[in-house]
């Protein structure tokens, strides 16, 4: 058993060298910074490299399996339950008991790994803060490395933020939320770190650096002997969950901590994964603390999965809520599966932002939040997500009024009738209409989000909602689907085809964006670049899997031109 930090490297020379000290085969191409170097230590990089070398072929195979599944769906196949794993779905087994530290997860707040956000979220009164390296973060080198620094300071309890504009210093309260961290998905590379000549896997960098620097402190201060805790995004099947389980076991072994110390909640946010929830649990049964309804990404995945199916066109995305039969079925089956296996079933995001200058609109927004959370807690969810500290009190009141002092509903709400849900229930076509305003909203929100992402912001307030990459993705794929199949806008009496008006809509929405943000900000921002990327993706003959994979090429900066590490 090898304790982390005992790889046997000699102490670095006191001579100042403006390059990262790296183990063999590792090449850092991001900008050198002395603060970053405290994260990118030789031992930490060796740990990441060990993970990359052991699991890269498994990851590549999993990505090839995704391509093969996409080919089948495009040829007319439908996702469904796997007959070969029926014994797992029908078996009477449970995941290991959840740690006492996370028994109560009534309200969780999410946000990027930015310094002020971390402090405000941990102080918000929420039970959990999910610090995000994924959809709420633009993965620039600066954001990723500063995020690791910020989390290390947060785990140690020393994090502060001096807001000079407000003449205020932010620091942690005595009581704070439990910290979960969401690394990137399997598909995203980290192009600033090369291992053996190829880009590292983004999630292994996020997980590896965070785990290496924080596991010991976290277990003492936050986890009550368990942890660290994670959220795992974008998985499509149990094969991908098995890789994560192996990563966790390797990390635990190398750190010399008990098997099952690391715990993770999996986001069910792809359509194929809803048919594999039991199987995902089975692979992660020693490390699982539940599932979460990632509903925006789930709708995005519905379109992506059925990109070759002209009979499964979505209405305006605003009409695809949790009352649609296929969405309610997904939620009910998730709750039933989680509680049957003894773990938490987490509800979806409340993305509203308090509207301070309009009390009437603000109350209407909060009423929407209350209704959504009331639906979730009545359905049996054990907790929910909020994107803004101002929503925590409202969400907490709804869950507490329904649950009392019980920390969760795992034993009290079983949703057994959901065992009768069929593949048809989970795939039922959504109902609704398509409108010009739906097309316009998708266009301007998609472009504005992408413009912010390209300039370093992954969590973006737009029209009183806190948006992340999932919103841009659903906006993009919905327009792509409507264009590909020549959809008619049937909801507002116009009767025009999207293909005939999209070019004009883009021009008019760009003009509207310029009016709304102001000419100076529009000129300095990357709105025109974002518009080119977004419209190219919407009009492409084949649908790209992820908008952020394409856009990532625009934010990768190598310093210096050749190499930034001491080999």
Swiss-Prot record:
EC number(s) from the headed UniProt entry: 2.3.3.9
Gene3D superfamilies: Malate synthase, domain 3, Malate synthase, domain III
NCBIfam families membership: malate_syn_A (TIGR01344)
Name recorded for this polypeptide: Malate synthase, glyoxysomal
Residue ranges of the TM segments: none
Motif Microbody targeting signal location, chain numbering: 565-567
GO molecular function list: malate synthase activity
Cell compartments where the protein resides: Glyoxysome
Catalytic activity line of the entry: glyoxylate + acetyl-CoA + H2O = (S)-malate + CoA + H(+)
Provenance organism: Gossypium hirsutum
GO biological process, one term: glyoxylate cycle
């Amino acid at each position: 058993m090898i304790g982390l930090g005992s790889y046997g490297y000699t102490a670095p020379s006191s001579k100042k060298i403006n390059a990262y000290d790296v183990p063999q085969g590792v090449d850092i191409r991001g900008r050198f910074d002395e603060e970053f170097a405290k994260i990118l230590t030789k031992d930490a990089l060796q740990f990441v490299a060990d993970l990359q070398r052991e699991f890269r072929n498994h990851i590549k195979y999993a990505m090839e399996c995704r391509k093969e599944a996409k080919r089948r769906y495009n040829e007319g196949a439908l996702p469904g339950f796997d007959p070969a794993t029926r014994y797992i779905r029908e078996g009477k087994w449970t995941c290991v008991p959840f740690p006492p530290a996370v028994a109560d997860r009534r309200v969780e707040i999410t946000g990027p790994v930015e310094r002020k956000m971390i402090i405000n979220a941990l102080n918000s009164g929420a039970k959990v803060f999910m610090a995000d390296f994924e959809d709420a973060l633009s993965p620039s080198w600066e954001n990723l490395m500063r995020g690791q620094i910020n989390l290390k300071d947060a785990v140690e309890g020393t994090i502060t933020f001096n807001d000079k504009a407000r003449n205020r210093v932010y620091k942690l309260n005595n009581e704070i939320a439990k910290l979960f961290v969401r690394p990137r998905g399997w598909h995203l590379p980290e192009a600033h770190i090369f291992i053996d000549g190829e880009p590292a896997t983004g999630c292994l960098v996020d997980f590896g650096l965070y785990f290496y620097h924080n596991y010991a402190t976290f277990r003492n201060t936050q986890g009550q002997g368990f942890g660290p805790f994670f959220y795992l995004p974008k998985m499509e099947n149990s094969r991908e969950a098995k890789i994560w389980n192996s990563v966790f076991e390797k990390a635990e072994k190398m750190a010399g901590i008990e098997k099952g110390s690391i715990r993770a909640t999996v986001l069910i946010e792809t359509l194929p994964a809803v048919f594999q929830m039991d199987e995902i649990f089975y692979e992660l049964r020693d490390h699982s603390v539940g599932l979460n309804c990632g509903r925006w990404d789930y709708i995005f995945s519905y379109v992506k999965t059925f990109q070759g199916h002209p009979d499964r066109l979505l209405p305006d995305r605003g009409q695809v809520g949790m009352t649609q039969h296929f969405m309610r079925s997904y939620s009910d089956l998730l709750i039933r599966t989680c509680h049957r296996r003894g773990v938490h079933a987490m509800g979806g995001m409340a993305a509203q932002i308090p509207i301070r200058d309009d009390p009437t609109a603000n109350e209407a927004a909060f009423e929407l939040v209350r209704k959504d959370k009331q639906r979730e807690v009545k359905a049996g969810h054990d907790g929910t997500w909020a994107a803004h500290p101002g929503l925590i009190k409202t969400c907490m009141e709804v869950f507490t009024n329904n649950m009392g002092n019980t920390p969760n509903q795992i034993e009290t709400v079983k949703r057994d009738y959901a065992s009768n849900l069929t593949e048809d229930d989970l795939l039922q076509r959504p109902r609704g209409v398509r409108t010009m305003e739906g097309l316009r909203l998708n266009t301007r929100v998609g472009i504005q989000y992408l413009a912010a992402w390209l300039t370093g912001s992954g969590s973006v307030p737009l029209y009183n909602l806190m948006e992340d990459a999932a919103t841009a993705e659903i906006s993009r794929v919905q327009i792509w689907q409507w264009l590909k199949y020549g959809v008619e806008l049937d909801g507002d009496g116009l009767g025009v085809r999207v293909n005939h008006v999209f070019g004009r809509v883009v021009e008019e929405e760009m003009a509207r964006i310029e009016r709304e943000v102001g000419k100076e900000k529009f000129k300095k921002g990357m709105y025109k670049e974002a518009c080119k990327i977004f419209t190219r993706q919407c009009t492409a003959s084949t649908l790209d899997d992820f908008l952020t994979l394409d856009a990532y090429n625009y934010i990768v900066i190598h310093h210096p031109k050749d190499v930034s590490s001491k080999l």
